[in-house]
UniProtKB/Swiss-Prot annotation:
Residues 27-53 are extracellular. The keyword Glycoprotein applies. InterPro entries: KISH_domain, Ksh1. The chain crosses the membrane at residues 54-71. It is found in: Golgi apparatus membrane; Endoplasmic reticulum membrane. Belongs to the KISH family. This is Protein kish. Glycans are attached at residue 35.
Amino acid sequence: MSALFNFHSLLSVILLLICTCAYLRSLFPSLIDRNKTGFMGTFWKLARIGERKSPWVGAACLIMAFTVLFWS
């Protein structure tokens, strides 16, 4: 089933995007920061969410990992 129609998969994809964008911004800030509008601006926004809500995103990733490993 597509990740767009399965809520659990959609949350996994969003969390992975947030974590990936925040990590890439820490390695290559100019790559993410030069595009703040349009479609590429979505990745800048995801990186900002990952930086500002870092403890909450980390907790959500741990909970998601637990559910993927032991619950599904």
